Amino acid sequence: MSVISIVPLASKPCLYKSFISSTHEPKALRRPISTVGLCRRAKSVTASMSMSSSTALSDDGVQRRIGNHHSNLWDDNFIQSLSSPYGASSYAERAERLIGEVKEIFNRISMANGELVSHVDDLLQHLSMVDNVERLGIDRHFQTEIKVSLDYVYSYWSEKGIGPGRDIVCADLNTTALGFRLLRLHGYTMFPDVFEQFKDQMGRIACSTNQTERQISSILNLFRASLIAFPWEKVMEEAEIFSTAYLKEALQTIPVSSLSREIQYVLDYRWHSDLPRLETRTYIDILRENATNETLDMKTEKLLELAKVEFNIFNSLQQNELKCVSRWWKESGSPDLTFIRHRQVEFYTLVSGIDMEPKRSTFRINFVKICHFVTILDDMYDTFGTIDELRLFTAAVKRWDKSATECLPEYMKGVYIDLYETVNELAREAYKSQGRDTLNYARQALEDYLGSYLKEAEWISTGYIPTFEEYLVNGKVSSAHRIATLQPILMLDVPFPPHVLQEIDFPSKFNDLAGSILRLRGDTRCYQNDRARGEEASCISCYMKDNPGSTEEDALNHINGMIEKQIKELNWELLKPDKNVPISSKKHAFNISRGLHHFYKYRDGYTVANSETRNLVIKTVLEPVPM
């Protein structure tokens, strides 16, 4: 590995967005913006993907901690050079034609005597159509048809489940598991006792020793159903344990195929760390592989064709939005702040991975802006800022006035002004959607977030390790789930009256669980690198302090158990019956939680943009699917 040479950095003014006019010409500045965000390293460092900390001498002569984060991987010139033919009107017209044809398929399987209807498999046909359009990312076009299909299936549901057709007396595991998952996700009341009948005399799920493709598919649907369990559902927990072991064993025995790839994907990403667009890309690839090996039926062929066209049309929009994001990042002056992580492309990948509705560009772009500031503040409070500077910045945010910059060090002034301008701008955007002023919500979330970070900075400066409970209470806020969620969802075309917002925002159980899961999962992936940077307090170290004699493995096992329990509790908060707060109102906040969880699946995919992260950007944003 090469060693980076130590060379003085030339002074270069930071040009923040708030000093750019509407014509993109620099405004006259009353004061110069210092280059204190540029650091001269106090020692040579090895060029690698590690995040070990070193000290740095900033331009104001202050010795500072830095995280040695790798630079932005996505050059703005490269982003601006992206192009796609799929924005042409001919592709939109093709999509409209295919949408009409797929609606006709839905209608034909709903007709009492339609040619596609058989009394022995009509229920399974309805469920398969719903499952396919959702996994292929085209369900937004068929909400009415989905409701009709699920109502039809539910009308035949019994305490023993269902068979593939309405005339089939005996329920089967495949149709029951698929139906259970889809119906529960769409708000129908479902009881897990329906799976008790599939147990043998020993209380285990009964299945033959022959692993046929049909049986494996049944267990795969059982596994998918088990992932939306509630905390008290013992039979669902048993189903998850059984199906996980069964599918892992199946992967060792069946040949590499589209089925094996589907199993591997579902086992890897489960549900709570899955991104809908990644699932869509993966499922398109699976069906494309099937199409090369066998003749697809007419329904699947039409669905696949529409999915590919829709994927690529949105891909064209993604590239245009990403260009806007990259220009905003470049003009904001952020590239000159060398102590921060520049992950605007990764943030955009996350948000476009959870919301593929074309008309929601404002939501996606502003989500990136908020997350970018969260990252600046994270790196400023975690490493670069001194404790006295951070106290000044926290107090300035509470004042929420441009004049508050007078007491700030130079490098913080530009950050403060840009944060102030952006949060106010987003509040104005939210007013258009919500019809009321939401700035106070945003300010309170920001103040709470910075307060939690200041507390952690004080712990670092004093070497204090809190109790596990004290750490987690603070960590739920510093996880940034609330601040990353609140303002963006208020810009959606979805009303969030106060009674709905209080079910999602602080201090709701939903917000508490989402913040806790993110903090716990993040710590299990980051604690070793954080410790190398001098940050001793983590949920692992706090657990070990509370439990003398325990090992890191003990702590990780305990925390992973907490995460699994809290995931089931979050399932309930999302899916519980509530006429006043429908699932659709909570879904975006939940999906943001899924997206953030995704990047901590194996390691910290933000701080170190590893191969999984880069491949995700390529597969879901940069590349279209082959037509």
From Swiss-Prot:
Q: EC number(s) on record?
A: 4.2.3.107
Extent of motif DDXXD motif: 378-382
This enzyme catalyses: (2E)-geranyl diphosphate = (+)-car-3-ene + diphosphate
Origin: domain of life: Eukaryota
One Pfam family it belongs to: Terpene_synth_C
Q: Where is it chiefly localized?
A: plastid
The cellular location(s) given in this protein's UniProt record come to:
Plastid, Chloroplast
| Binding-site list for Mg(2+) 1 | 378, 382
Provide the residue positions that the database annotates as binding Mg(2+) 2: 378, 382
SUPFAM superfamilies according to UniProt: Terpenoid cyclases/Protein prenyltransferases (SSF48239), Terpenoid synthases (SSF48576)
Transit peptide boundaries, per UniProt? 1-36
Give the cofactor binding note.
Binds 3 Mg(2+) or Mn(2+) ions per subunit.
Keyword Glycoprotein listed? The answer is no
* Alphabetical keyword list: Chloroplast, Lyase, Magnesium, Manganese, Metal-binding, Plastid, Transit peptide
Tell what triggers its expression: By jasmonic acid (MeJA).
Task: Give one GO term, molecular function aspect.
Answer: lyase activity
Q: Which family does it belong to?
A: Belongs to the terpene synthase family. Tpsd subfamily.
- Report the function annotation for this chain: Terpene synthase (TPS) involved in the biosynthesis of monoterpene natural products included in conifer oleoresin secretions and volatile emissions; these compounds contribute to biotic and abiotic stress defense against herbivores (e.g. insect attack by white pine weevil P.strobi) and pathogens. Catalyzes the conversion of (2E)-geranyl diphosphate (GPP) to (+)-car-3-ene.
This chain belongs to which protein, by name? (+)-3-carene synthase 1, chloroplastic
